[in-house]
Amino acid sequence: MGTFDDLTKKRNVVVTTYKRDGSAVATPVNVVVLGDHAYFRTWSTAGKAKRLRRDSRVAIAPSTARGKPTGPAIAATARLLRPDEVPVPREALAKKYPILQGKLVPLAHRLRHYDTVHYELSASEPTGPPN
């Protein structure tokens, strides 16, 4: 199985999700690694959230801020966190990215009336994109 150890100190990563037709969509996100899992947040109507509702398989790799991969991808499975599971990763994201994830992203989500959702990524065996 893959591990997220290499992503612990990375500022930017790219999460690749899959459309219905199996084509990959790579999106840069901020993640925080806690133990054997990585966490990120988005809003509930974002394209990646819609794709994750249909297919939880993802690939995650270190990247530039614009999403260009800078290292090997790790196959993973994404799980939407329940509201009672959110405080720990939310606080960890705010600690790692104090301005962006601690202030700006939450403010933008509130101002735009977005429902913020958090995902947990667990490393898995690579299975390839869906058919």
Show where each model-derived region lies.
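Residues at structural and domain junctions
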Residues: M1, L7-T8, A38, A75, ...
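Generic intrinsically disordered, low-complexity segments enriched for polar/acidic and small residues
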Residues: M1, V15, D36-H37, A94, ...
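A generic short-segment signal for beta-strand/edge and adjacent turn/coil regions
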Residues: M1-G2, L7-K10, T27-V31, T42-A49, ...
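Basic/polar N-terminal segments that are highly enriched at the extreme N-terminus
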Residues: M1-G2, T127-N131
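Extreme N-terminal tail/first-helix region
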Residues: M1-V14, K68-T70, K103
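Short helix-to-loop capping/linker segments positioned immediately adjacent to catalytic or ligand/cofactor-binding
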Residues: G2, V15-G22, L104-H109
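Short beta-strand segments
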Residues: K10-S44, L52, V58-P62, G71-I74
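Short, structured beta-strand-loop surface elements
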Residues: T45-H118, S122-E125
